Each structure stands twice: as structure tokens, then as C-alpha cells.
Amino acid sequence: MGIKNLKSVLLLKHSLKVLDSAVKSKEIYVDFLGLFMAIAYSVTSTAMLHHIIKEKFKFIHSIADNVTVFVDRGSISLKTSLREKRKQSLKNQYKRKQEELKNLEIAIDNLSVDDEMYEEQKESLFSKIDKNSYYMFLADKKNMEAIITDVLASLKNTEIYYCDHIDAEFMMCCRAREYYTNNGTWPSILSSDQDTICLVCVDTQEKILYDTKSVYKLSPNKYTSYLTKLIVLTNGCDFFRGLYGISINKDNYMRYELFTEFNRENAFRSIAHKNYSLNNSNTDENIDEISTNIDVIFDFINHYTSLNEDAYKFEDLPDIRVKDFLDVMVRSKWYEAKNKYDLGSDILQNIYNVYKVHRRNYEKEKETNILKMIESYKYRNIKINTITTFIKLLGIETSDSICVLGILAPSELYIGFEGRFYFNKTSIIKSSPKLININI
């Protein structure tokens, strides 16, 4: 579970590196249930589970002087909807396992004793039956809780920290940062949850991280925290589904510009790296409501990633589409541009208005001819060659890069944003072969 694609992106950016061997440390903090579940669903019996857990903690004690495990306890209100989805998923998986068991038993009955591979096939099928049967055994909450209690009781020389109504990985990272504040180094962290990677990016100190199979060195820089927050925003986490219609992954992460401060404006700059059509059905009232929801999401992400326990006081977080997020960010900027340039329905007049704002010392003697041309085309369909002629009349040139003003053929006006892209009320344009960049 956790934040999709975060680990793969950090590995590609070399912020996270796989090490060849474990690193000896004074302290190691363990997200217990993440480790336990990974093992529990890979074995076929409780005896095997106890044995593997025992061997795992033997290894953990060999790489650290002190071991502390963090255990989830109690429900988390912010995860109510997620909890219901997991219950339903477990029910569906249980039904699938029942069906698989029936099919496996039929497959055994259909084996031929005359087949050279009879024993191997039978052994393979019985192994699958054992694994499915144990999965169904663990699906009973009482069985699972009893085994967890027994396993925790069996741990020797291990401090157990129960986390009531707050995720164990969150509390583990809070305590780890406190340890760093007091001792100058972070304890090693063992967790299979990608949220843990996000949470330990709270500062730029190096950390040693383990999952169930590998050891890593995390070396965050001043942009890593922003990247992790941006991925939470786009890809979601256990509490928030992410912006619908967008996902950062190992193939596209390099297209997103990074900043040191995570806020709406910078996220807007990062996400608007390509052409988008906006949700033009949103009313101004809808926009205000969506804007409020966006503020809630950003407040939550900043609380959560800064290890502020108030993150768990948030109610259910709203669902937001990426087009709605961009619509909110563009709408206010478009209204500002309309007021600044007195934009209306006349494309030539709009170009001239923008020109006058940016060329305060323009040649007044040209104004008569300019106004005549504007007037002559006032009620006519404007084509791109007309706009080109008008631009020449103004004495300005076109450019190969994004400028103050852009015209998309045949006659759609766009305002440039910081030389990054163009926008109007209907869309964001990063590039187009039909676009004229007007260098005012």
C-alpha cells in the first residue's frame, strides 16, 4: 500500500540507492504489521510463519544494537472509506480462493498416476492448496489477531511501541526524527510501505531504509520533499485518491518541474507541462467550492509530510480531477488578464490592448491606421493571415518561444504565463504547430 510509484521514481532520480549489504546501526525502527503481513501471506502454516519471523528478527538484531517495533492499534477515522474497500476486497479474494480450492481439488482428482510427472504435479497442487487454505485461515480476523499477539509476545530484546489511532509508519517516523534531533543521526528504518519513504523525506539527512528484501540509502536534496508531496497530490495515498486524470511514474517524472516550496502555484507550474483542455462546465460557484477543497488537500499533504499529527484530525478528503485543479488555477488568472487588458470578443482589439499595456511608448501616429483596421474587421471572421498583417502594422515580431501573447489559429487568444505556457478560459497550451508567439 502507500504512494504509488514513489520508490521507482526516487530510484531513478538516484535519491534512493540499493546497497549491496546491510548497514550496522545503533537503532532500528520496524513497521511491524507491514513486515508481518508480507510474511504471513507467503507461508502455508502458523509454524512456518513463526519460524520466518524469528529468523527475520535474528537478522534485525544482528544489524542493530537496539530494536523498536511500531504496531498499529485502533481505527483511524480518516481511513474509514479505505477500510471498507479493504473489507470488500478481502471478501472478494476469499471467494476467489474458495473457487481456486475447488478447482485445485478437481485438478488432483484428474491427475493420472501413469503420468511421469504425477508426483511433482500432485506436490505442486497440494502446495497451492495449503497456501490458499492458510490465506483463508488468516482472513478470519480472530485468527490473525491471535497470531499477531503470539508473535509479538515471542520477540526478545525488542521494545514494542503501540500506535493508537495513528499509522505505525507515521508514528515511527515521528519518533525517528525525535531520535535524530537528540542524537544527530536517524535510526535505520524497516518498512514495506511507500508512505514511509515519503515521510522520511521530511529533511535532507541521509537515512538507511529496509524493506522485506533489500536495503537502501536515501539521500534527499532540497527538491526531494517537493517531489514526494507532488506525487502524493497526483498519485494519491491511503487517505486521498490523488488528482483524477494524472499520475507521475518512472516514464514521465522528468517532465515535472520541481521547486523547494510545495504550494498551489508551484504545483500548477509543475503539472501544466503539457496541453490541457479545461472543464468549461464549472460555474464560478463550483470553482469556489473546488478551490476550498484544493486548500484542504494541500493543508493535509503539508501536515502529513511534515510529521504533524494534526493530519489525522482531517475529515474525509475530497476527490478532485486534475482538470478541475487546473481550471481553478487558470480561472482567476484569466479574469486578472481580462481586467488588465480589457479583453473582449474582438481579437484585433484584444491584441492592441495587450500591446498598449506593454508598449507604453508606442507610436501614437500609427493609431489611426490601427483603429481603422480594427474597425474594418469588427464584424468579420478573422483568419490567421489577417492577424499576421495586424501584427506587422503594430511593428512587432513573432517568436519561437512562449511570449506575453499567443494566437492559436484561426483566431483564439492566449495569455503567456511566465514563459512556461499559454492559457485562456478553455485550455492550457504548452506547444502547437498552429500557435503564433507574439513578442510584444
From Swiss-Prot:
One Pfam family, short name: Pox_G5
Similarity comment: Belongs to the poxviruses G5 family.
Protein name: Protein FPV117
Biological source species: Fowlpox virus (strain NVSL)
